[in-house]
């Protein structure tokens, strides 16, 4: 399965910048829904952070997904790859 990778940066209330990728099926292009996926992920964290906007969440590229990402997408409609300051 090919997935679209949305590169995302979010300002945390403690001053740190979260960096994570939102992965969705490559044919999925509903930007508002992708932002909703990211906001759902951010709201699951124990710290406060800003809401996602199109300025901080941008399409980056398409890649082939590993099995774990395919499983996440099958269950949730999306997958998150944590990069920096996500915990």
Predicted regions and their residues:
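Short, well-ordered helical secondary-structure segments
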Residues: 7-9, 29, 65-67
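Short, charged/polar N-terminal "headpieces" of proteins
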Residues: 1-18
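Generic structural hydrophobic/aromatic packing signal, biased to beta-strands
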Residues: 6-8, 22, 38, 80
